[in-house]
């Protein structure tokens, strides 16, 4: 996960989603699921997220889905509230289900809270995660399969392979998979530091006593 600024409510959302949604709820109080009037606004949400899933932080070429951060089942009053909607790929949305407050909100994640490890492409929570949120961060990794889930590792590997094969620049990789690009940049920084280190400076030498 990476930091995401709350996306401003788009024009027409109130008239085309919130108000008719609330009217529909009043007329269908026993419905299992709300009418998906938010679908026409998926593109607005995706653009606000840079087309990156709010949970796996990977470009979603399928167009993605709208996730209710607080599920419509638990909070039907928020089913048509823009502030409760997040952009997510289908797999993440399905895995999250009704976890609600247990999973970190993309809008509350801070910079550097998560990092990819190379070459495994596994994701871990860093020491930058506030102690009071650490348990939720670890739960999020496990619940959504973000740590080392087969599906997400495969998706990461696809983007990383494009970079390794020269089909994506580092900037292009950052656009599609920013956490992988950060990991590559860290590796390049370490390599450059080692290359620029003067010969014989890796360890201070103390002459033996006579």
State what each model feature region is:
Residues 2-52, 75-80:
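Short, charged surface segments at domain edges that flank catalytic/cofactor-binding sites
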Residues 21, 32, 57, 122, ...:
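Amphipathic alpha-helical interaction segments
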Residues 38-65, 89-92:
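Short cysteine-rich loop/turn motifs with clustered Cys
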Residues 55-87, 98-114:
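Histidine-centered nuclease catalytic patch
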Residues 96-164:
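Conserved, surface-exposed functional patches that form binding/active-site neighborhoods
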Residues 133-210:
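C-terminal, charged low-complexity interaction regions
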